[in-house]
Amino acid sequence: MDDLSFDAATTLRPRADGSTFDLDIHPLWTVGDKPNGGFLLALLGRAAAQALGADTGGAWDVQSATVTYLAAPALEGAEIHTTLLRRGRTASHVRAVLVQSERTLVDAVLVLGALTPGTAPRYNDNAPLRIPDPDQCVR
């Protein structure tokens, strides 16, 4: 694992079934000695998108996620199991579970859809919030 990029750290190795992925939890993406929760969610999101894309032949992006962090995984190999819960024309639901030593550690349900190519997320258009001077704030 010499490549320190996020893309390299979130690389998944799909199994023949197309719904299970092997991975290594990169030690760079940690808080102390535990993997960062956002990093783990990114792994689950990539697995869900890859499983759905392999199943439908399309490109899918995570739109929302509900995640339960049951325990922190060790910095070693793990696997992600995905299950298609609902397939739609514009949005699909996938469950992704991170497992290590046959123990479920992170469980997520993700909603995926296709983003319009070349469009920026809507939050980029928002003006910065006006924050009052500290002496005008309620204490």
Report residues per predicted region.
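Terminal targeting signals and extreme-terminal segments of soluble enzymes
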Residues: 1-139
